[in-house]
Amino acid sequence: MSRPQVTVHSLTGEATANALPLPAVFSAPIRPDIVHTVFTSVNKNKRQAYAVSEKAGHQTSAESWGTGRAVARIPRVGGGGTGRSGQGAFGNMCRGGRMFAPTKTWRKWNVKVNHNEKRYATASAIAATAVASLVLARGHRVEKIPEIPLVVSTDLESIQKTKEAVAALKAVGAHSDLLKVLKSKKLRAGKGKYRNRRWTQRRGPLVVYAEDNGIVKALRNVPGVETANVASLNLLQLAPGAHLGRFVIWTEAAFTKLDQVWGSETVASSKVGYTLPSHIISTSDVTRIINSSEIQSAIRPAGQATQKRTHVLKKNPLKNKQVLLRLNPYAKVFAAEKLGSKKAEKTGTKPAAVFTETLKHD
């Protein structure tokens, strides 16, 4: 099966003579539901354990007064001469008491995700990076990008200096997305601002390489720009926030290696026992399939249109004659002939006269 060709661009932004076939992973089904499920589970695996102190709320001496004083049985601080004496303690409803069900560090922090499900979500996220509408909907500034997916020469992997790397990104049209990241830096709302998460900013392009010859260090200090190896692509980077459509810049070597990593119709995947997911139907034009002669010859002609009554008022057939006749047509004949009021005729034979005379004489 022939696949579309993708042009390779040089570090100066010019299109080269090289053209690569679109890898098969870009034709994988895009499943936002699977991506969201896997992302929410995988995103929990990097959490650090936290808990309140086991002594919190219990660092005081308190004892219940018991019954007979017309007050609650909650433990109360002893002593006198201060406002604290006599106040409730320990309980979660008390000021200065412990919380209800204090958090423990031995909570189950990690979530297990099926291996094949994670691969399905990653393949969907990769396929979504080639859909321009999804990339734009995610908020990336790709109006000046010559082509999506964007493939750059392998020379990008050998860049050592940040200045040269930024110049290469500007040359291929990613400058607008870099400016968007710089302008988006804001102070975080909430308590995270004093927990080493003081600032928030948007995500920029993701640069995918095949071999690190200096590109990682060159781009690690550019705001919003992330790097990833093509052999270990991460769903957290391909779809941040479980939102499909990350702007990805591929190097030529990494783009060529996608078929080796994920497999295709002719090349087996390097993942053991893995088959790339495919669509249930190969043609997306369902109208053309339904109206084809093969389908139309096998289906029955359409019947009369039926309209379902949304609300039916139930009527008592014992009081409503029309409803009674609709349910029981024989009721009309039954009423007209007055079959319910006729007396049954006795068909028994009269005794003989000799028998009657005999009874009288006796």
Swiss-Prot record:
InterPro entries: Ribos_uL4_C_dom, Ribosomal_uL4, Ribosomal_uL4_dom_sf, Ribosomal_uL4_euk/arc_CS, Ribosomal_uL4_euk/arch
UniProt main location, coarse: cytoplasm
Entry PTM: N-terminally acetylated by acetyltransferase NatA.
UniProt GO molecular function: RNA binding; structural constituent of ribosome
Region (C-terminal-extended nuclear localization signal) residue spans: 277-362
Chain positions found as Omega-N-methylarginine: 95
Keywords: Acetylation, Cytoplasm, Methylation, Nucleus, Ribonucleoprotein, Ribosomal protein, RNA-binding
GO cellular component: cytosol; cytosolic large ribosomal subunit; nucleus
Record-listed N-acetylserine modification sites: 2
One Gene Ontology term from the biological process aspect of the record: cytoplasmic translation
Variant or mutagenesis effect after changing residue 319 to A: Significantly diminished nuclear localization
Gene3D superfamilies: 3.40.1370.10
Resulting phenotype, residue 98 to E: Leads to a slower growth at higher temperatures but allows RPL4 assembly into the 60S subunit
A Pfam family: Ribos_L4_asso_C
Domain of life: Eukaryota
Compartments, as annotated in UniProt: Cytoplasm; Nucleus
Comment on protein domains: The eukaryote-specific C-terminal extension harbors a nuclear import signal and delivers the ACL4-uL4/RPL4 complex to the pre-ribosome, triggering uL4 release from ACL4 and incorporation into the 60S ribosomal subunit.
Note: There are 2 genes for uL4 in yeast.
Family under the similarity heading: Belongs to the universal ribosomal protein uL4 family.
Function: Component of the ribosome, a large ribonucleoprotein complex responsible for the synthesis of proteins in the cell. The small ribosomal subunit (SSU) binds messenger RNAs (mRNAs) and translates the encoded message by selecting cognate aminoacyl-transfer RNA (tRNA) molecules. The large subunit (LSU) contains the ribosomal catalytic site termed the peptidyl transferase center (PTC), which catalyzes the formation of peptide bonds, thereby polymerizing the amino acids delivered by tRNAs into a polypeptide chain.
Complexes and interactors: Component of the large ribosomal subunit (LSU). Mature yeast ribosomes consist of a small (40S) and a large (60S) subunit. The 40S small subunit contains 1 molecule of ribosomal RNA (18S rRNA) and 33 different proteins (encoded by 57 genes). The large 60S subunit contains 3 rRNA molecules (25S, 5.8S and 5S rRNA) and 46 different proteins (encoded by 81 genes). uL4 is associated with the polypeptide exit tunnel. uL4 interacts with its chaperone ACL4 and the nuclear import receptor KAP104.
Name this polypeptide is given: Large ribosomal subunit protein uL4A
Gene: RPL4A
